[in-house]
Amino acid sequence: MFISGSISSKEIPDDVVKSVDESRRKNYTILVGDARGIDKNIQDMLKADNYKNVEVYHVGPSPRNFSDREWVDKRIPVDIEDEKLFKNGKYTREAQMLKDKAMSDDADFGLVIWKDTSKNRFGNISVSKGSLNNIYNLLVQNKYVGLFYIPNPEKGIMKFNDVVEFEERVIEKLVQKETKDYYYNMKKNASNSKAEKIIPESSNTEQLSLFS
C-alpha cells in the first residue's frame, strides 16, 4: 500500500489511522516517501507501533526522514546532470515526482490524505500537486485509491478505481478552481503510454475493506 499526502497536513485523521492499523494486521508492505508532513507522520506512527514491513522511497543519497533503520531504504536513481532533476545542489520537484511515480508503479493500491490547496508564504493559492499526481498515476493503472479529502472529513475515506469516477465526485464537485485547472492540464499532458495493470478481483475486495 502506497500512503501519501499533502506536505502541509499536520495530523493523521482517525479514519486513516484505522485503515493503516488494518493494513498492519494484514501485514501489507507499506510504501511511504521521505518528505515532511504526512510522510513523516506516517513514518512516526509506524515506528511507534514497531511495524517493520515498510519501504521508504527517496531520491537523495539517504532519506530526508527515516524513522526506523530496520526499514527498507529504497533509492530511486536520478540523473543529477539534468537540471530539471537536480539544480543548485538540490533535487527538484520533478525528481520527487519520479520517486512518487515509482511508488505508484510498485504499489498494488494507494491511500491518499489530501488537501488540494493551501496558501504559500506570499499569500497565493498553491495546489497540492504531488498527491493529485499520485491519485491519477494509480487510477490509470486500474489500482484502487482510498482518498481522505481533508476539507470534507465527514466523507471519510472515499473509494475509487477509475479516473472518470474520481473526476465526477472530486474534481468536478469538491476541489478549488486552481486544482481543477491544474488537473485537466496535467491529464492532457500525461503520457498515453502508461501500461495498465489489472488487479485480481479477490485483491480488490480485500483492499476495499481497508477503506470502510
Where are these regions (language model features)?
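STAS-typified acidic loop motif
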Residues: 1-8
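Acidic/glycine-enriched connector segments
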Residues: 9-164
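Positively charged, lysine/arginine-rich intrinsically disordered segments
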Residues: 208-212
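Acidic, PIN/NYN-like endoribonuclease modules and their adjacent C-terminal/linker elements
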Residues: 143-192
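A conserved mid-domain beta-alpha-beta active-site/ligand-binding segment of alpha/beta enzyme cores
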Residues: 81-92, 178-204
